[in-house]
Amino acid sequence: MRQALILFLLILTLFAGPAHGQKSGQPEPKFQAAMPGYTYQFPRDDFSHDDFRIEWWYYTGNLESETGRRFGYQMTFFRVGLEGDQPIDNPSKWKVDHIYFAHMTVSDIQNKNFHFFERINRKGIKNAGAESDRFKIWNSDWSLTADGNTQKIIAQENATGIELNLTPIKKRVFHGKNGISVKGSDKGNASHYFSFTRMKTEGSVFIKGENFKVTGTSWM
């Protein structure tokens, strides 16, 4: 777990910088920077944006079974663009232009157990991906999709995981100024950032093969 987190932080360090400020005579950067003036369009902006270097979909929530047993969960899908400013034309299905990370945790409050799982895959051979024309993100058989206003998370590993339907019950919140969350003083060192702060959640939590029907609330 620690090695994977270090790897992810290293990739963020290498590729999260603003895609601007190129020296004269160099090609224009491939990736856009998060700049003021962006006009959000939904549901399009719930989908993937491959012209930005880093993107993630993050969920966390508190759940309770029909018998009152409590659980917590966290689910995150990451996309990191790797081609850089001068992509190489490579027709191979094995080429790596994006790497996809996924983290899932389940907290079993009653038994004081914390379950953590992660995946790292490439896009080229469809082991993972994030669509730009519809709400579909996946990493192997873990997935995040939508049916109308309801989002669905499916993720299991070693018979432990979640299958949840999440429906917003509060309006979308934009962080920072007009959805621009500033990360530093340099121009473009920011992210487009919005959330659903309360989502009705129902479905199943799986603990080593045991299925618990649950309800609760989540934050995206």
Where are these regions (language model features)?
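Positively charged n-region of N-terminal signal peptides that target proteins for export
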Residues: 1-4
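Bacterial N-terminal signal peptides
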Residues: 6-15
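Targeting-peptide/extracellular-domain and disordered-appendage signature
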Residues: 21-220
